[in-house]
């Protein structure tokens, strides 16, 4: 018997029921009309159990299967359909109507059991439905909607409605009240108007009418003041009275309200035509041409001022003026007084009404041969080129012809008093008429050079120097009053001026180091109470650095006077060593032969640091005559060749220590430094102590260096120091940090190991180059060397120290497994592992070098095994199933990652569930990413907010889902998509994914109802094996996640449908595969998903004006109307008018009117404005093969032998047109034509006769037209063979 789908009636059973229903009335009717018959043969129930007796017409019976009658008792309730069910005849099945259930449909389904009604509504269970009785303020089928009582706008007069649950509240506009703001409030009810004012009610206010009360204000509260309206004019003062007022006027004003401005100019007080100005006129104050200074004031408005004509002055213009009294003539001009004026007689070189103009004599360009003119008073100076001289550069200089200057010098020609000569401009370090004197000399440290110079010159020092020392005095100049010094301080230049032993000014150029061994030119000079320091250097702006400052020199002398007329100078000092040249003191050159002692001529020296003498990374310092090596610790010695020996503490586990007894205590500022190398995280490094207590203690704790002083907080140095590398440790302490240090210094531990335990126990490792304030505390005796090295400090005692930094033998016993080779790496070891093994001790086997995975899968190492990782393609097939029953249940599964691409809008990516309490899933819902985690502990779980990001686009997407706090029992879960920096938090809390591993692990399903590709899928960092190992590959020690038995292998590789084979793109469009979708790159002129639509670029009306024209390649062109231009005819173009904006160059005429005027260019010109000159033959005017030749700016045609004329337009041999009447030419021409026609007819007859005679033979000559070329015959065709002749 076929099984019916649950909830669907059996068709055969339904048919039986219908037959019963139709035949039952008929049988009843027959039963009532047919007469009773004798008892049936079946009355004795002769048939066997399970069968039914049927009487026959002959009075017998037959036994057959029993008819079903299980529904006869109507066992189904509530209108359910009863259908008999076999094989039991009494069997039946009830098909319930909606709303009921149970074997007999006796149970009414309570639709209210799921509590569908919200907000406290009452649920009423009905047949196959429910009904929610909503509380006040809610509506909807499930009372999910809150009723907005404000929707009907119940609040009047602009009131704001605040919706509540089942109610509303009106916030009324000012001036209204009531539950619905329907009441206009009467603000006059409180009688706000005082002093009998009348109140008028307004909306949200009132107005007091104070007329007739004598008061004013909002409430008629202020008495009216008559002066408040400022009735007095011209800033007069108003005196308040009882119902009246009085104005006090300023002088010059009158009237009851001071409204009258008295006219002081009415009597014409100004003489000689002077202009009278009233002081009461405000327009005469302020501005550029104001008659009165300052601002207008009524206090000074009385009176007048006379503006006198030229030549007069005084209060009333009664005094005549002497114009020369003010000395108006400038620059020594003589003033001559004139009536109402003056005249200046100017000296030479000046001009102008007041001789204020300096006559520029250079305006006449007096300088010749390119000379530059500089104007002077009543003259000029010409700066001539090198080969010219004289006042006007008119004389060619010949003085350097045959000069005897040396090659390094420059000859400068001179022309003076009509005589040609020259001078030699010497290079640095030389002097003399022919640069024969050497000015270069060397200065040694401690041997300064003394010199005397004549007094009276400008106070200054100038020289060139070179040195490698950073400090020292270059030169000093002294006399009875002032002293000037030029020195190097920290390798930079400094100048100091003293006056009577008092420092007046110090100038510095701090930005350039000058101890580089190169020559540098410097100068310091005092001029016009300003001291200026100059340095010529490439690093300066414009190659010159300047520092200057004002100087105020003392007037009294206190220094010991030197001999009259002599100043002294000193070159060098106790520290400076180098070379000087071109030294000038107060402008006087100091030559080496005049200096006396300590002078070494020339500047010869060897660079001290080449080749580099310092080893072990030491830095070489060139000290001019010798060198110094600044050694990197722990190296020492003149060339850093020696190393301060290190000491190994605790070698072999034996406690070690060293103690020092200081001869004297360190100063208030203490610096402790040493080199440290260790792999131990704890141990005592150094401790100051006295006989009773410990002072400063430096020790290792948890790999960090700590320094402790009693009574002060500990100092912890950042970072870890126990990495086995050598580190320089330097600690500095101030006077307020250290009190009583003690004279004993314990290093590496105390004599008794137990005494070191509070600070981590005895130290194990290496210490080297221990210093206190730069002084050594050596663990072993140091060899004697030069005094530049740090000195030793204190006595020494040591126990179990090993010289050098010696490592423990970490390879004994051998820690490497599987044949690894052990190498000692200072208190550590390194195992070189053979193939297929890795790890610190080669204990971890590598599986992937054996290539256990077949392409396209790749092998990925996992703990105790490997996984074949690959991309896989799924096509709505069965999902890939995996199990983590072999995975360690102790491993934390705090997240998963998955890569996929699909265009499905509904699909499962990953799904696993352990009952209803634990599970994880990722899916695509409506084209967006969805997911969630249920982690037990009675929590509802965490769900990704919807809608999630869109992912059904065919592109690869990478999802990472992880716990925010993996170590916690429950945590938020975070999701990263495609490497986003900010994750999305799932709503809710859940625990980890431990239910996916261990013996009770659940099945993990991938790609269920999914079409697309999966990439790497990992749980807790362990990938799932989408690909299987190659046959015969050795399995790993543990298979963490395995394929579920019976799961078919997926299709490896990501392969989309062949959407571009054949290409769906029309009209030569290029198909682009987008994974289960395609896109067409259409050619010009086509568009649409398949390039099926012809592009009309003019359809969108791109042209703002004019007409749009389509090109065959799909482009459009806007053809603009007059007055507009641009690609889309948007730009207004001014009309072209010959008299307005069209200018034709070189005399070419402008033709045409607005808007299209243009230029008609003359011969030889071209361009829009005839601005381009053309070559005469550029247009080639010659005809009939003539050659154009340009001659004198015009073209000339050279014709061949058959033509002539200006343009070769006339053919030679043809009669020229004659100046005869037309008839005299036409008649002879007609006769000639008739004669030619007759001759042609005769020739044709003869040719026909000749052709007939040649029939039956082939003669190529017969195919030719007599007297003509072969290709000119347009009637007869040449046979192919004839073309070869």
Curated annotation (Swiss-Prot):
Disulfide bonds join 71-82, 76-94, 96-105, 112-123, 117-132, 134-143, 150-161, 155-170, 172-181, 188-199, 193-208, 210-220, 227-238, 232-247, 249-258, 265-276, 270-306, 308-317, 324-335, 329-344, 346-355, 362-373, 367-382, 384-393, 400-411, 405-424, 426-435, 579-603, 609-620, 614-629, 631-640, 766-805, 811-822, 816-831, 833-842, 1013-1054, 1060-1071, 1065-1080, 1082-1091, 1098-1108, 1103-1118, 1120-1129, 1138-1150, 1144-1159, 1161-1170, 1177-1188, 1182-1197, 1199-1208. It is linked to Focal segmental glomerulosclerosis 9: A renal pathology defined by the presence of segmental sclerosis in glomeruli and resulting in proteinuria, reduced glomerular filtration rate and progressive decline in renal function. Renal insufficiency often progresses to end-stage renal disease, a highly morbid state requiring either dialysis therapy or kidney transplantation. GO terms for cellular component: apical junction complex; apical plasma membrane; apicolateral plasma membrane; cytoplasm; extracellular exosome; plasma membrane; protein-containing complex; subapical complex. Residues 1-350 are annotated as: Required for maximum inhibition of APP amyloid-beta peptide secretion. Residues 1-28 form the signal peptide. Residues 1249-1285 are annotated as: Interaction with EPB41L5. Residues 431-603, 647-805, 871-1054 form the Laminin G-like domain. Belongs to the Crumbs protein family. Changing residue 1249 to G: In RP; uncertain significance; reduces protein stability and expression. Glycans are attached at residues 235, 267, 438, 478, 669, 690, 786, 800, 836, 886, 926, 1009, 1141, 1158. Changing residue 620 to S: In FSGS9; loss of function mutation. Changing residue 1129 to R: In FSGS9; uncertain significance. One of its GO terms (biological process) is positive regulation of epithelial to mesenchymal transition. This is Protein crumbs homolog 2. Associates with the gamma-secretase complex via interaction (via the transmembrane domain) with PSEN1/PS1. Interacts (via intracellular domain) with EPB41L5. Interacts with PALS1. Changing residue 1260 to A: No effect on secretion of APP amyloid-beta peptide 40 and amyloid-beta peptide 42. It holds the Pfam family EGF. Gene3D superfamilies: 2.60.120.200, Laminin. InterPro entries: ConA-like_dom_sf, EGF-like_Ca-bd_dom, EGF-like_CS, EGF-like_dom, EGF-type_Asp/Asn_hydroxyl_site, EGF_Ca-bd_CS, Laminin_G. Keywords: Calcium, Cell junction, Cell membrane, Cytoplasm, Developmental protein, Disease variant, Disulfide bond, EGF-like domain, Gastrulation, Glycoprotein, Membrane, Repeat, Retinitis pigmentosa, Secreted, Sensory transduction, Signal, Transmembrane, Transmembrane helix, Vision. The chain crosses the membrane at residues 1225-1245. One of its GO terms (molecular function) is calcium ion binding. O-glucosylated by POGLUT1 at Ser-267; consists of an O-glucose trisaccharide, in which the O-glucose is elongated by the addition of two xylose residues. O-glucosylation is required for localization at the plasma membrane.
